[in-house]
């Protein structure tokens, strides 16, 4: 049974950084916004960090992979992938570390730089996005240090002081300095000063399951309280079944209450999809209907194509020359190195990578040999092993920019279903030979830095294939024309002018840094555009080209 339809100005699907950013901007401008989130609110006592067995719970109900959690709000993701997805208010920020780098100017013009495989230029520049980066940072609350010479000047942007580097950060910075390599204290979405009822970070440890105190900046703290106070209608346990269209325009959606199974309809003048780099193409493909037989916004067949994860290798080692105490402090990276960020074809590949120093995990992870492969023995030698390893652990991530390849994609699984009977997402991802060459070169450089620090028992994961899907990018990418993209530069789908996509799907290329800062900036920009051009968008019968679209 389907209830009678509600009416709203803008329907937003998904409550993570994309959906939250658009919603907040629109309700601040006075628009009526309804946001549908298929998961629940997570209250502070529900965070695993409230419990002694948090390391165990992170392997069960708080596992990164929805296939492991299997909660009613999750949907299966099949194929060659290990997806990192959360379905709850705030989206997958409930699993992020809060590392908050921006893309660099060169990241927006990779098509011009090399154009390999499916690489194209972004339809916007760093300079166009920079003021929205600033606005987004102010909403979240960011810690860090301005002045990194590898970025354009940002001296006017307010920051909290950086998270404390600890012995881990100071020791690795010394090693990088001895090699003459770039390093800089990381920007993190972690506040180090109290802010609007949120507590400052106290270096209490791992926050990879959100922060019940609010020190880790997630939309549950930074967006939704304000948006709801301004009139946003956030509906949880609301799983969207299909987006509807009529006469070439989106008209709203049908959603299922996952608690009762009841179906509800909602009509809207504009629809914004912000359901993640897997969830958004899945929903658009599920929305196949008359006039859109291959899925919504998919007349060119590119919905779900060009999936990027970042190519990833992880070094884990033990340092005996000095205590690292990596378990102390927020998990957000204390520092990074972009010494090898830019393309140098003399290395035999295009694109580059960044190094991120990461805190180590807790005692149980150490004993199990997480990332290191060195498992604590039972018996008399257990304590000796533990004393040598816990507190001496070094972990460094190599994030490389993978190429957008058309066959790396999200489709609908013909067999698997979610708890509502809707098709699961199926993912295919294979590393390009350029990605593998980049990863091999990158891990060699990280080994070099670890040796400079005195690391022993050094191990690495190899090219993680598939990589953990922390970053789900590119599957409905922005572009300059309908032949090679799904949306124009304002996130309007080429096929349906009042249907927008604003999330990791929008990213044209992936850069070699974490994408959440960029997703948030794009959301502020898209919300600004929709609020200023609302009437124009509602009246449009076709999506304008980037040249013809009305400016802000």
From Swiss-Prot:
Induction info: Induced in the presence of MTBE or tert-butyl alcohol (TBA).
Names of the cofactor(s): FAD
Keywords: Cytoplasm, FAD, Flavoprotein, Oxidoreductase
Reaction(s) this enzyme catalyzes, per UniProt: 2-methylpropane-1,2-diol + NAD(+) = 2-hydroxy-2-methylpropanal + NADH + H(+)
Keyword Oxidoreductase listed: yes
EC number in record: 1.1.1.400
InterPro entries hit by this protein: FAD/NAD-bd_sf (IPR036188), GMC_OxRdtase_N (IPR000172), GMC_OxRtase_C (IPR007867), P2Ox-like (IPR051473)
Enzyme class: oxidoreductase
GO cellular component, one term: cytoplasm
Domain of life from the UniProt record: Bacteria
Subcellular compartments: Cytoplasm
GO molecular function: flavin adenine dinucleotide binding; oxidoreductase activity, acting on CH-OH group of donors
Signal peptide boundaries: none
Free-text function comment from the UniProt entry: Involved in the degradation of methyl tert-butyl ether (MTBE). Catalyzes the conversion of 2-methyl 1,2-propanediol (2-M1,2-PD) to hydroxyisobutyraldehyde.
Similarity comment: Belongs to the GMC oxidoreductase family.
Protein name: 2-methyl-1,2-propanediol dehydrogenase
């Amino acid at each position: 049974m389907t209830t009678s339809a509600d009416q709203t100005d803008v329907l937003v699907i998904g409550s993570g950084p994309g959906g939250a950013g658009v919603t907040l901007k629109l309700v601040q401008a006075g628009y009526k916004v309804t946001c549908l989130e298929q998961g629940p609110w997570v209250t502070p006592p529900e965070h695993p960090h409230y419990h002694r067995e948090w390391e165990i719970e992170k392997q069960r109900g708080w596992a990164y992979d929805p296939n492991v959690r299997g909660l009613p709000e999750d949907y299966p993701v099949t194929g060659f992938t290990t997806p990192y997805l959360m379905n709850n208010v705030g989206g997958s920020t409930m699993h992020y570390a809060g590392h908050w780098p921006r893309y660099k100017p060169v990241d927006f013009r990779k098509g011009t730089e090399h154009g390999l495989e499916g690489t194209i230029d972004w339809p916007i520049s760093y300079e166009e996005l920079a003021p929205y980066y600033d606005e987004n940072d102010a909403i979240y609350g960011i810690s860090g240090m301005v002045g990194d010479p590898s970025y354009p000047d940002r001296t006017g942007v307010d920051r909290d002081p950086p998270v404390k580097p600890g012995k881990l950060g100071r020791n690795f910075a010394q090693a990088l300095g001895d090699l003459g390599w770039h390093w800089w204290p990381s920007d993190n979405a972690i506040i180090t000063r109290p802010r609007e009822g949120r507590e400052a970070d106290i270096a209490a440890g791992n926050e990879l399951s959100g922060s019940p105190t609010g020190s880790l900046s997630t939309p549950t703290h930074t967006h939704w309280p304000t948006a709801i106070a301004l009139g946003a209608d956030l509906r949880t346990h609301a799983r969207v079944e299909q987006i509807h269209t009529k006469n070439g325009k989106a008209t709203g959606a049908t959603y299922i209450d996952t608690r009762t199974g009841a179906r509800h309809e909602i009509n809207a003048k504009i629809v914004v999809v912000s359901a993640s780099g897997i969830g958004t193409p899945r929903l658009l493909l599920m929305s196949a209907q008359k006039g859109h037989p291959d899925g919504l916004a998919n007349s060119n067949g590119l919905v779900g194509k060009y999936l990027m994860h970042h190519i990833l290798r992880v070094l884990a080692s033990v340092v005996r020359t000095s205590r690292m105490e990596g378990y102390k402090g927020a998990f957000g990276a204390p520092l990074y190195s972009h010494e090898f960020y830019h393309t140098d074809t003399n290395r035999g590949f295009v694109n580059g990578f960044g190094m991120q120093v990461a805190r180590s995990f807790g005692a149980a992870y150490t004993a199990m040999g997480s990332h290191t492969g060195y498992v604590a023995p039972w018996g008399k030698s257990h304590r000796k092993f533990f004393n040598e390893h816990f507190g001496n652990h070094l972990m460094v991530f190599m994030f490389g920019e993978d190429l957008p390849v058309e066959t790396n994609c999200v489709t609908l699984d013909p067999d698997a279903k979610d708890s509502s009977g809707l098709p699961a997402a199926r993912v295919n991802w294979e590393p390009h030979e350029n990605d593998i060459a980049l990863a091999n070169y990158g891990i060699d450089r990280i080994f070099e830095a670890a040796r400079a620090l005195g690391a022993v028992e050094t191990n690495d994961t190899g090219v993680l294939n598939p990589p953990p899907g922390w970053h789900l990018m590119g599957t409905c990418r922005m572009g300059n024309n309908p032949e090679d993209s799904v949306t124009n530069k304002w996130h309007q789908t080429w096929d349906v002018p009042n249907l927008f996509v604003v999330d990791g799907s929008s990213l044209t290329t992936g850069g070699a840094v974490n994408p959440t800062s960029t997703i948030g900036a794009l959301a502020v920009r898209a919300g600004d555009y929709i609020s200023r051009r609302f009437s124009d968008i509602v009246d449009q019968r076709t999506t304008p080209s980037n040249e013809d679209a009305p400016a802000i």
